[in-house]
Every structure is written in structure tokens, then in C-alpha cells.
Amino acid sequence: MERLLALMARLRDPVEGCPWDREQTHETIAPYAIEEAYEVLDAIQKQDWQAFPDELGDLLLQVVYQAQLAEEQGRFDFADVARIVTEKMIRRHPHVTFGADVLGHTRQAEGAANNLPASAMPGQWEMLKEQERKRSAQLGGQKDQRLGALAGVPPALPALIRASKLASRAARVGFDWPDVGGVLEKVHEEINEFSVEMHKGDREKMQDELGDVLFSIASLARRLKLDPEACLRQACDKFTRRFEAVEACLAQEGLSMQDQSVDQLDALWCAVKKTEKP
């Protein structure tokens, strides 16, 4: 770790560092953190354990890079980042006894300790996060009433993930359908409203209504305990697999997709589907 920190400091050296790295700011390198996180996810999904440590390293580099920029500005350094996340994880695990290697002293677990079932952990985690948000707001001079149920959901999240989190937060305070059937009815209702605007041809209203359709579908996934982002990734993978299979079938005959009719392509698509395991 020390070598990596020293390397980043060297890359940012005003005299002997890398010209490109010296020019970067928090804002210019921020997109790389998202890109690297998705590459980590891709390696996990593919179970590419050879590439996995490499991708994790690329993601870690983004954390080190941002910390180096902050250190240069006198805000904090990497040690602060590690300390803050360690203290946060300790706070959020009151049911675990940590030794001197973590705390510098031993601590007895609180409450029911390790008797807490795993199913209770997400609820406890969210409760502790909410307490932290309130303390943070109070330290910042905000009043409790400004911390609504949706506080802390970052607008920069991918839209499907954000929709799922917003719906989940709302459900925790009772803003939810009594059963999954109600959510499904809402999906159909939003699709019908979109259909009306689509036939009118008003693109602004179409966008608004299609957004409602997507949000309601994310809510349906949340109610079914499904990850909407994972569901869509799976659908994308399936589409890619089938599309490439159609291309391969045509290539074997020396044909291209552009020369086929819609009916011919649909027939090939259905044939590919039948070859897949149910």
C-alpha cells in the first residue's frame, strides 16, 4: 500500500511527475471511478478470477488518486479515508466484538451480540445509517425535520438503482402498496398512460410517462426482492448472446443482417431461442 501511495505522489509531483496526471482534478477523474467499478462487476459476473485482482487494483487506484488530490489541498489524506471507514464499520457492527488489532483495545458486543440473525442485519444497518445522517446534519447546523425519508440517496446513482432505493426508503415509512399485485397494477396503469401520450406524439410528455413506467418497474423489482439493475444486465447479456448467434448463423451462409427481411430475422431469432436451455 505504501508503494502505491508513494507512486501516486510521484505521478503528481509538480516537477518530475507525469504531465497528464498533474493536470487532473477531482472532477476530471471522477468518471474513471464509475468505469472501474463496473469493470470489477464485470469480472465478478464472468467469474474471471485472473482479471479480478487487476480490476480491483484499478478501482483502488481511483481511491488513492482522489485522496492524493485532497491531501495536496490540505483536506485529508488516504490514512484519514481508511480511519473514517474503519470507524464507520465498527459503529455499524455493534453486535461484533473487535479486538485490539482493530480498536487498540477490546470492546464487548452490545445488546444481543452475535445472536442477531443475518436477516436482522439490513434493518439494523439502515437504522444506524439514519442515526449517522441525523448526527451529521446536526453538526452541520441542519434541523432534524430537513432529514426526510429520502435523504442520503445520491442523485448521481444510476437511475434504476436510485429508483429502487427511493422506493425502498418510501416503503420503510409506509408509502407502499399492500401487496405485489398493487405494484403490478401500477405498472399497467403507467404503461397505459404512456400509450396515450405516445399516440398524441408529445415527446416531452412521452418522456415523462416512460420515466414513470421505468420507476414503477423498479418498484416492482424491489417488492419482489429483485435487483432491477441486475435484471436489466441479464436481459442485455441475453440479447447480446442471441443477437450474436443470429449474426453467426447468417455468416455461415455468407449472408448479412442488412439483406434480411424483418420476418426472416425474427424467424432466426426464434430458432436461436429454441436452442437455449429453458
Residue positions per predicted region:
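Flexible "arm" and connector segments at domain edges
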Residues: 1-55, 61-210, 214-278
